[in-house]
From Swiss-Prot:
PANTHER family assigned to the protein according to its UniProt record, in alphabetical order: MITOCHONDRIAL TRNA-SPECIFIC 2-THIOURIDYLASE 1, TRNA 5-METHYLAMINOMETHYL-2-THIOURIDYLATE -METHYLTRANSFERASE
Intrachain S-S bonds: C103-C199
Keywords, ordered alphabetically: ATP-binding, Cytoplasm, Disulfide bond, Nucleotide-binding, RNA-binding, Transferase, tRNA processing, tRNA-binding
Region called Interaction with tRNA, residue ranges: 149-151, 305-306
Organism field: Clostridium botulinum (strain Loch Maree / Type A3)
Residues that bind ATP: G8, M9, S10, G11, G12, V13, D14, S15, M34, G127
UniProt xrefs under Pfam families: tRNA_Me_trans, tRNA_Me_trans_C, tRNA_Me_trans_M
A single cellular component GO annotation: cytoplasm
Gene: mnmA1
Entry's family note: Belongs to the MnmA/TRMU family.
Protein name: tRNA-specific 2-thiouridylase MnmA 1
Active site residues of this protein: C103 (nucleophile), C199 (cysteine persulfide intermediate)
An example Gene Ontology biological process: tRNA wobble position uridine thiolation
Marked site positions, Interaction with tRNA: H128, Q338
NCBIfam families membership: PRK00143.1 (NF001138), trmU (TIGR00420)
Length: 356
C-alpha cells in the first residue's frame, strides 16, 4: 500500500517541486496550504509572500497540474499564539526573535504533523533545503546539496519523533535544478521569486507592525551611551535591533550602533563598532539532533545568524541545560533572542536561543 504524505505548499517553487518529486517516488501525495493570516489583517499581496491569498491560488494550480488533491487548513489560532504573540513579546523585552524558526517548531513540524497523524497520514513534507538521513538508530540532518540555499539553520529544533515522519526531497538538489524541474513539468511558479521577508510582515517593518497592533505598548524613550548619558530620543525599543546603524533618526558625526536594549528603562544603548564584537555567548532552550545531551565540551562550527558562514567554536554544557559558546574569532552583533546553531562539517549538531 502506498505511504501517504501531507505536503505543506506555500505556492512557491520549492514546495511545488517537493510535491511532484514525492509523487514520482510513489507516495500518495496530498497538498495543503496552511492558513495563518489573521482576519483583522489586510494581508498584503506580494509576489513571493508565503501563505497569502495569492499563494493559495498558486498552490492550488500546481496541485491540479501534478494531479494531487489540495486543501487549505486553518492554523490561524496556533500561529497567532505561538508565532505572532511570541514575536511581539520578544521585541517588547528588547530581544530579536526569529519567527521562521518558531513557526517550524510549533506549526510546520508540530501542529501540521499532528493534523497529518490524526488523518492517518504517514509523513509530512516541505520544500526545505536539508537532508534527513537515518544513521544507526537516530535520524540526523545534513546540509543540503545547495550550500547557498541550505536551510538547516532553521531546523535545529526538530525532534527524533518529527524527523522520523518528515520528508524534504529538495535537499538533494541545487536550487537551479529545482527551477529546471518546475519548468520541465510546466509549472508557472518555476520563476517565482523566493520570499525573503517575514510572511506576516511583507514590508519587513517590524516596528511599525507592532506599533499598529499594540499602540499602547510602544513608547518613546532615550538613546543613551554606555555611561547612561542621554544622546537623544528613540521612537520605541521595538524599532531597533543589536548592530543596527541605519534608521536611528539622529546624526552623531561618527557611526553609532545599537549595542544594547534595556526594556526596563525603555532605553536603547548606542556605542562604537568595537562594542559589538564578542567571542562568547550563553544559549538556552538547546536541542541536539545526533544525540540527546552534551556531556563535555565539543569543537563545532557555529553561526549566530541565518546568512553567516559558520565559525570555529567550542560549546560547553553549563547549568540548567544551557550552553556556553566560545568562538575562536570575534563575532559581530551577537543578538539576544536569535538562534545560535552548531555544525560538524555538513552535520547539524543542534542549536539554541541566545540568552546573553
Amino acid at each position: 500500500m502506498k505511504k501517504k504524505v501531507l505536503v505543506g505548499m506555500s505556492g512557491g517553487v520549492d514546495s511545488s517541486v517537493a510535491a511532484y518529486l514525492l509523487k514520482e517516488q510513489g507516495y500518495e501525495v496530498i497538498g495543503v496550504t496552511m492558513q495563518i493570516w489573521q482576519d483583522d489583517e489586510e494581508f498584503i499581496e506580494k509576489e513571493g509572500g508565503c501563505c497569502s491569498l495569492s499563494a493559495v491560488a498558486d498552490a492550488r494550480r500546481v496541485a491540479n497540474k501534478i494531479g494531487i488533491p489540495f486543501y487549505v487548513m486553518n492554523f490561524k489560532d496556533a500561529f497567532k499564539r505561538n508565532v505572532i504573540d511570541y514575536f511581539v513579546d520578544e521585541y517588547m523585552e528588547g530581544r530579536t526573535p526569529n519567527p521562521c524558526i518558531t513557526c517550524n517548531k510549533f506549526i510546520k513540524f508540530s501542529s501540521f504533523l499532528d493534523k497529518a497523524m490524526a488523518m492517518g497520514i504517514d509523513y509530512v513534507a516541505t520544500g526545505h533545503y536539508a537532508i534527513i538521513e537515518k544513521h544507526n538508530d537516530r535520524y540526523i540532518i545534513k546540509k543540503s546539496e545547495d550550500d547557498k540555499k541550505d536551510q538547516t539553520y532553521a531546523l535545529y529544533n526538530l525532534t527524533q519523533f518529527q524527523l522520523e515522519r518528515t520528508l524534504m526531497p529538495c535537499g538533494q538538489y541545487k536550487k537551479s535544478k529545482i527551477r529546471e524541474i518546475a519548468k520541465e513539468i510546466g509549472l508557472r511558479v518555476h520563476n517565482k521569486k523566493d520570499s525573503e521577508e517575514i510572511c506576516f510582515i511583507p514590508d519587513n517593518d517590524h516596528g511599525r507592525y507592532i506599533k499598529n497592533r499594540f499602540p499602547n505598548k510602544v513608547r518613546e524613550g532615550n538613546f543613551v551611551d554606555k555611561q547612561g548619558n542621554v544622546l537623544g530620543r528613540h521612537k520605541g525599543i521595538v524599532y531597533y535591533t543589536i548592530g543596527q546603524r541605519k534608521g536611528l533618526g539622529i546624526a552623531f558625526g561618527k557611526p553609532m550602533y545599537v549595542v544594547d536594549i534595556n526594556p526596563f528603562r525603555n532605553e536603547v544603548v548606542l556605542g562604537d563598532l568595537e562594542d559589538l564584537l564578542n567571542t562568547e555567548l550563553i544559549a538556552k532552550d538547546i536541542n541536539y539532533i545526533p544525540f540527546d545531551t552534551l556531556k563535555e565540551p565539543m569543537e563545532v562550527e557555529a553561526k549566530i545568524r541565518y546568512s553567516q558562514t559558520p565559525s570555529k567554536a567550542i560549546i560547553t554544557p553549563i547549568e540548567d541545560g544551557r550552553v556556553r559558546v566560545n568562538f575562536q574569532e570575534k563575532q559581530r552583533a551577537i543578538t539576544k533572542g536569535q538562534s545560535v546553531v552548531f555544525y560538524k562539517d555538513d552535520l547539524l549538531i543542534g542549536g539554541g536561543i541566545i540568552e546573553k
